[in-house]
Structure formats: C-alpha cells, structure tokens
Amino acid sequence: MNLYLIINIIGVAAFIGFAFLFSRNKKKVQWKSISLLLLFNTILAWFLIVFPIGRWMVNQAANGFNWLIETAFSGVGFAFASMVQVENMDVVFSALMPILLVVPLFDILTYFGILPKIIHALGWGLSKLTGRPKFESFYAIEMMFLGNTEALAVSSLQLKQINAKRNLTLAMMSMSCVTASIIGAYTQMMPGEYILTAVPVNVINALIVVAMLNPVTVPADEDTIATMKSSAMA
C-alpha cells in the first residue's frame, strides 16, 4: 500500500479520534451520518483530484475565476497605473484590490435569485444524502459560496429561531471557512485549482467535526428552513 495513502488514513483516524475525545455528548454521536459524510468526502476528493471529468471541472472553474481576477486587475491598473506598473507591487494592489471588483458579482447573482437557487438545491441534496439537519446543510453550502460573514448575514432570520445548541454548531462551522475575497487572494499565490478543490472538501469536513463535537438531535417539526412568510405568520 502506498505510504502516502497510509499516512492519510492515519490522519483521518486521528482526526475522528480527537473530535470524539472532545465531544460534548459522546452518546449522541450519529455514526451513520458521520460515516456517510466521510464516504461522500472521500468520493468528492477523488472525483475532483483524480477523475478526469472532475479535474476538468475544477480547472475550468479556476480558469474562470482567474479570468475574473485578471479582468478586475485591468480595471485596477487603469485607475492606479502608478501603483500597479512597478517592479515590486504591494499586496493591496496585486491581490486585494481586484477582489473588490469581483465580490459584487456574487451580490448580482444573489439579487437575481441565481445563487440562492444553487445553494438551496445543493443544500437539499446534501441533507438528503447525509441525513444532517436541513439548515446545517444549507448553511454549509452558503459558507462555500459566500464565506462566513456573508452566510451569517443571509441566515439571520433562521438564527433567531433555532436553539442555542444549534447556534453553537453554526459558530463552529463558521471557523472553518473564509470569505470570497480571501479565496481570491489565495488564488494569486498558488494554483487556483487546488484552492477551489479544497473549498467543498473543507465544507464537508466542517460538518463532520461539528457532528462529533456538538451532536444535536433536531425534531422533524424543527428541521425546517425559515422564510420571511413563515416568520410573519409566526
């Protein structure tokens, strides 16, 4: 067996062991759900890293993101030519300024309802596949697309309706992600395909960790997604 594979198996075992060791309620850990998440994450990682179609999809996504960054960088160069056309450019202008022009794209997609539909579809599928509560699954997908701060803002209505234990779960999950602007900055430092591959894998890892550290049983009548209409009726 490949030594690299053995090291990774040991790492996953240690990862699960430490999470179980610090669990708030070891008796309520849902091993079936965690096993499904581990299996799904393994298949996802293999698909994105090894499978040709998966690698092609990641490369296309990375190329698209890099094209957005380059286009935004052209705008920065037009506005701040004296700051950009230098031998040693500051990180503010080389990595962060272009992101300020890219992030509004997510706002536009949200405004027209495109991004919410994608998030809801993926969140619903993840919940059905793994057996995790609906909102936690939706929130994981929101983090993947929007980042922690934006996801919390979008989900503010739901946060007011769920109990403190589930809020703790979301707080833990929020520590595992970064905003789109930081991801964009990372793509300027290393190949974008590695960054974009790590994002969905990391989201599933976050679900695994919180399912063990803070296991919560959600009754069927509470396993819902809050909407403005349902809130007004309540």
Predicted regions and their residues:
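C-terminal ends of transmembrane helices
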Residues: G17-K26, T110-Y111, L152-L157
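Long, contiguous bundles of hydrophobic transmembrane helices that form the permeation core
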Residues: V203-A234
